Amino acid sequence: GTAGVGGVAGVGGDPIADLVDKVRTEVDPAFVYEYEQTKFVPPAGKTLLIVGQTLEEITEYTASFPNEPAPGGWAAYWGIPSTDGLANTAVNEHGSSQNHQELVDRFPNTVLQSALWMVGMWDVAKDTGRGVHDDVIRGFSAWAKTISRPIYLRIGYEFDGPHNELEPSEYVTAYRRFVDITREEGVHNVAFVWHSYAAPPYKGYALASWYPGDEYVDWVAVSLFGHLYGPDPGANANAVFDFAKAHRKPMMIAEASPSLGIFDGDLHSWNTWFVNYFSLAYERNIKAITFINADWKQYWWLVPPDWQDARLQNNETVAKAWFMETAKDRYLKQSPQLFEQLGFAP
């Protein structure tokens, strides 16, 4: 049972509480373990809530729900070979904007979940590994030291995705070089996130072949889209959870969305996707969860043709259920206590 606004679910007939009550809150004890070599992990029984992933989407989200609490973190993107999108606004050819510093300035007492594009094509990863882009890494380091808040950095996100064409050896070399330089530069507010596509991998390489090593990885992450239209996220995702457990790393859902859409007057997205999203976070003791509040039709060049508009503001009932679930103390949101809860001392 879930205590919701208006009393306990099912009592007094609160339809929103009834939706929230569908979430399975049991925790698999196998996924409760001590973490080693990590940073900025929420306390036991807590999970960091993050929303993304463009300036436009984040602005729309906050404008759509002005009276709801802000999440504990915001998701943003940038990419080698440039620091554009960190301290300035970078706009892509499709009109989406990124600016990490703007998120810092607009939302005190929140963290950043930052995705670093570093692919195999055009020798991006290879060049990074051989020092061509050291100035970019140093530029990131200099900027990171100015913001005094946690950054969860996904280096070469979805490293095993066929769309990124990353050879494991080139990826590992580039990833390690990035981390080594940030450490040399005295950066202490960045947690390094190793983020799997959680789907059939590039060239069938083994997951472990992309692993830079325990001393280089603070968190392990997955993307979960269509995976969550059922109670089990699938063999590839499960392998990542098992890998994180074997290496004693906390887990993050770094990207997630009910990609088939959220529609007005239709609770299908809640019942078939959101229930599984939250339930998996409980079951696997996932320490950070990200939600992408996006209209995927705007990403037509990037995503499968069946991906739809999956923004919470499309359905008032689904949005209310989202905010009732995430209102629980379990979810770390924007607050003056957040950094302390994450073990971060500015």
Predicted regions and their residues:
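Aromatic- and acid-rich polysaccharide-binding/catalytic face
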Residues: 69-81, 114, 207-232, 254, ...
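Acidic (Asp/Glu)-rich catalytic clusters
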Residues: 61-70, 94-113, 139-149, 209-215, ...
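Glycoside hydrolase catalytic-domain groove-lining segments
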Residues: 90-111, 215, 219-262
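Ser/Thr-rich, Pro/Gly/Ala-heavy low-complexity intrinsically disordered linkers and tails
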Residues: 1-18
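Substrate-binding cleft of extracellular glycoside hydrolase catalytic domains
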Residues: 77-200, 307-314, 326, 334-345
